Design a protein with these regions (language model features):
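Conserved nucleotide-sensing/catalytic segment adjacent to the nucleotide-binding pocket
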Residues: 39-42, 48-94, 108
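NTP-dependent small-molecule kinase module
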Residues: 167-231
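Conserved lysine of the Walker
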Residues: 13
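ATP-dependent NMP and nucleoside kinases share a basic, alpha-helical "lid"
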Residues: 98-151
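Short hydrophobic/aromatic beta-strand immediately N-terminal to the Walker A/P-loop
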Residues: 2-4
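Post-Walker A helix-loop "phosphate-sensing" segment adjacent to the P-loop in P-loop NTPases
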Residues: 21-39
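The conserved Walker
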Residues: 9
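Hydrophobic positions on the alpha1 helix immediately C-terminal to the Walker A/P-loop
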Residues: 16
Length: 231
């Protein structure tokens, strides 16, 4: 089974993917027949260009031409069949590529990325898909908190990137919401916690995903407020 977790940068894809894996481990066990039950991969690894090249070409990572979508679909289909793949690895800290890695699928593969539902070929690789659509201001806070802590950016640089990427988000990322089986929406609550709303559009059992969304809500911490002009 292949589960796709899709959304903009900073929308909570990594947190939700980890929560889904944790729910699977809690409900059905973490391992079976000597191997991990869940394999998780980041589809940012399929960027076509490193950070410096994207800057030279004036492309954002959200643009389809900036990603190896055909190879992504090929590898997802192979993992769905139970076959191993040798995939690229993108290093977010340095904005470069690390050596390729060998991936053997578990019973369940969780693939998270920006454009996982962009093409029909990609969509056909998934058994269940989730789109993360948090409140825009919350997403900005999450992205600033992550990118300043883990990727070496200043808050001002993150805000500039968000502004620059907004058109590509609206053009390429947001429309994928229509193809998702489950849409998860977080928003700030007056008491400082987060509210959670879901839109389920499938008859499949999605109880693990919904439990994971609640688990992720409990783990999420709102970052400090950001300027309105960053929106």
């Amino acid at each position: 089974m292949v589960i796709g977790v899709v959304g903009d940068s900073g929308s909570g894809k990594t947190t939700l993917s980890a929560a889904i894996a944790a729910e699977i481990a809690a409900q059905v066990g973490p391992r079976v027949t000597g191997h991990s039950r869940v394999t998780s991969i980041c589809l940012d690894d399929y960027h076509r260009y490193d950070r410096a090249a994207r800057s030279r070409l004036d492309l954002t990572a959200l643009a389809p031409e900036c990603n190896r979508l055909d190879l992504m679909a090929e590898h997802l289909q192979a993992l769905k069949r139970g076959a191993s793949v040798v995939k690229p690895v993108y290093n977010h800290e340095h904005g470069t590529f690390d050596p390729d890695e060998h991936v053997t699928p578990g019973d369940i593969v969780i693939a998270r990325g920006l454009l996982a539902l962009h093409t029909a070929e990609l969509r056909s690789a998934f058994d269940l898909t989730v789109f993360l659509d948090p409140d825009p201001a919350l997403r900005i806070r999450w992205k600033i908190a992550r990118d300043t802590a883990k990727r070496g950016y200043t808050a001002e640089q993150v805000i500039q990137h968000i502004r620059r990427r907004h058109t590509d988000y609206e053009r390429y990322v947001a429309p994928q919401r229509a193809h998702a089986d489950v849409v998860i929406m977080y928003a700030p609550a007056p008491d400082g916690t987060l509210t959670l709303r879901t839109d389920v559009r499938t008859k499949r059992d999605v109880s693990i995903v919904l439990a994971a969304a609640e688990r992720a809500r409990g783990q999420a911490v709102s970052a400090a407020s950001v300027p309105v002009e960053a929106r």
